[in-house]
């Protein structure tokens, strides 16, 4: 199988490295310099060349030489590479490389041989990354407030896997808080209703009809045993059954989006196992938790504030504003304390952690990052990488007007209803068309609109157009072939140059933990494809199928097939199926 990681951009990073080795051997550069800041990437202005490197700029000072002088020596070495037409020095010492057309034709052939592996990377080095996402309270079906974080987290996990990481997709089940007791009481109301009582759901309970089947199931199993019983007799049972039913519903809802977690971790089980207590003892042993007094909250005066001794985590040592309590005065764990123990457990089995949170949790990012830094470095090691990605809410519209809420769900629009109406692929791609921390409108009419202003349609239409041309070519006796790629000129090679950026886009997106970059890249590639395709409207010689020229047709169909391959690969990373026809 072709090594898809040896793409042109990665290969030229090695070419630059070899040229620097030659300068070291010649004594032009000392052999002790770090090259970690050296880059090889397309210049912002394509007219400047195909690739650019900052090697002379970043190495000149530590080498004790002038950037342009070093650039001159490095350019001379780079021009020895057969695929380099010229190495031109720009500004204070950047080097712009112009490559032969055959270099790009070779990359096009590589896409063809690598197939679904084109763009795959080994940059992750098989390191284990735990990506925790969704983690919605198990109190009802998934709604569109959860959707964006679910898609961002799932796409990020798949992106990290494609870039060489081992990934754990985790869902943290918040089943130990007061909200699950409220759920149990709500289900008890539905249980009594199933027994024939007329009930009104009081303020503060969950009113959604989705709890009706849970109540019916309990009524069928237990009859009226718990109808008049004291809450203490049924609360734990009803809570357990209700949470299980809600998690089944949540798994089903997520499956409609193609999301399947590897691990579901229960907060209640974590606490019952004693692991939270063990984490506290570990923290105390490392002098990271102590018993102390909290400062009075802002707005409180000494007269109306009664200080209480609480176990406090030394988060100020790690950049937080103040030390944080891990337990309440009644001995119950604070949210922060439970999260602390949970992240402590996650860190035991992963090299890096990523959490996808709603933007409304922004205020707790600093303290949990401080906690993870402490937990993973207390024994003298380097803190494990930990990032929190914040996701803004989505406003649902229909033709520009806010969407009415769902009666079934009580007060929100369910995810399953949205997926049923517009489809999984539309939902997933749309959620990645903006940075996750930017506001987003999801308009039911616009996301299915057949328009170039709709990025979902625009990318899928490019792939469908390619498939249609390949089918048409086959019907007319033409097959894609790499035998005559020398027939492809500047306009076709411009497409190849853009497609060739896919592997480096994968690595950059993975490093930044930003899967939306793949969606942006696919939109750019689709736009370039449509522009070239449309040339054939007025110029028959620019069409993919030129009846009088079988060699050109075979080469262009090969080009189309590989552009389609890159689009498919990118969509697959995002969990979206490429459309064969529209």
UniProtKB/Swiss-Prot annotation:
Keywords: Aminoacyl-tRNA synthetase, ATP-binding, Cytoplasm, Ligase, Nucleotide-binding, Protein biosynthesis. It is an enzyme of class 6 (ligase). It is found in: Cytoplasm. GO terms for biological process: arginyl-tRNA aminoacylation. Its main location: cytoplasm. It catalyses: tRNA(Arg) + L-arginine + ATP = L-arginyl-tRNA(Arg) + AMP + diphosphate. The keyword Protein biosynthesis applies. A motif ('HIGH' region) lies at residues 136-146. Monomer. This is Arginine--tRNA ligase. The lineage of its organism: Bacteria, Pseudomonadati, Pseudomonadota, Alphaproteobacteria, Sphingomonadales.
